[in-house]
Structures are given as structure tokens and as C-alpha cells.
Design a protein with these regions (language model features):
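Conserved PLP-enzyme active-site core in the AAT-like
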Residues: 8-13, 20-193
Length: 194
């Protein structure tokens, strides 16, 4: 990328401070969950952390929650759109909730969760919003640019409430097999991943 490149300029202007490069998308999700857990313990005193996710969440989230002692609160998907149910997500949020997990797209159906609406819920509760963009990270960005996503909604750091994103660079990003990245909106959250 060059400074004259639109994508470079727009992402630089978002002040995204940092990322972790990892061996797999699973590791990216593990690191994000660890960061949310530690941040909630240190800053809010949360002892029984929970993450709210749709039943269609990638199995890596189940593993991350099991490893780090985080309760996974599964909510149904909307029967019409197959997106994470906003109504059920809102009902599931409580003082132990450390983050909402959204998929872009879902592993099972290829549906993009309503990240903008989930972001509003996360911001209203002062919790994180992780966007699992491992499966479609590069494709969804270019599909949007080329006008191939009908009724496209924002799903990345352009949405204020998105605090972390996982992206598999090896899927259509021309990187070595397994290379993944977890990006943090700011360095203060990343500090909690160590």
C-alpha cells in the first residue's frame, strides 16, 4: 500500500493501533477472548465473565471460552435473516457480559451479522464487540468496494463499537497457510492479551 491508496488512508485515519499476527484463526479468537476477560477482571471486577454469541458462532469461540473460563451465552438466529437475533442478544446482556461476538460471515450460512446494530448494543453496555472476519475478511471488503454486497452494512473498524477483529490472511490474502491476525481498536485492550 502507498499513502495515496484509498484503503491505506482510510484505515490509517481510524487510529488502529495494533494487532497480533498468529498461526491460525482459532488463535486470533483465543487472544481476543483472553484480552476481553482480563480487561473485564481488571477494570470492572468481573469474576464470572460471559460472551454472547449466536448459535452459529465458529467452534473456535467455544474452545476459547472453555480454555479461559468464560461462559458462552448462545442466542438464536433470526429465522428470516439467519443473522444473530438482536432481541435475544439484548436480553442476554448482563453485568458479567464482557463482549458480543459477531460473524462476517457466519461459518454455517455465509450470512453477515448486523454489526452496526450489535455495536450499538455493545456501546450501550460499555462492552467489547468482536467481529470474526476470518472466513470472509478479504472477500467482503472487496465485495463491498465492487458493489457486490446488496444492502451492505459496515462491519469493520469504521463502526465505532467494534473493538477487535480476527482476519485469516491466508484465505484470499495470498499469505502462507494458517496466517491470521487479530486487530485491536486500541493498545489498551491489546495489553490485556499478555
Amino acid at each position: 500500500y502507498t499513502p495515496d491508496n484509498y484503503e491505506y488512508r482510510s484505515y490509517q485515519s481510524l487510529n488502529i493501533v495494533t494487532k497480533h499476527s498468529n498461526n491460525t484463526g482459532t488463535e486470533s479468537i483465543l487472544i481476543a477472548v483472553l484480552a476481553y476477560r482480563e480487561q473485564a477482571r481488571k477494570e470492572r471486577g468481573v469474576e464470572n465473565p460471559e460472551i454472547v454469541a449466536a448459535v452459529t458462532a465458529h467452534p473456535a469461540l467455544y474452545k476459547a471460552c472453555r480454555y479461559f473460563g468464560v461462559r458462552l451465552v448462545k442466542v438464536p438466529i433470526d429465522p428470516v435473516t439467519f443473522q444473530m437475533s438482536l432481541k435475544h442478544t439484548e436480553k442476554a446482556l448482563n453485568s458479567n457480559t464482557i463482549a458480543i461476538y459477531a460473524s462476517v460471515p457466519t461459518f454455517t450460512h455465509g450470512v453477515i451479522d448486523d454489526v452496526e446494530s450489535l455495536s450499538k448494543l455493545a456501546q450501550s453496555r460499555n462492552i467489547g464487540l468482536h467481529v470474526d472476519n476470518c472466513l470472509g475478511g478479504f472477500l467482503t471488503s472487496y465485495m463491498e468496494k465492487e458493489g457486490l454486497l446488496k444492502k451492505a452494512k459496515l462491519f469493520d473498524f469504521r463502526v465505532k463499537g467494534v473493538t477487535t477483529m480476527s482476519v485469516d490472511v491466508h484465505k484470499y490474502g495470498f499469505a502462507s497457510k494458517g496466517v491470521s491476525v487479530v486487530a485491536f481498536r486500541d493498545a489498551s485492550l491489546r495489553q490485556h492479551s499478555y
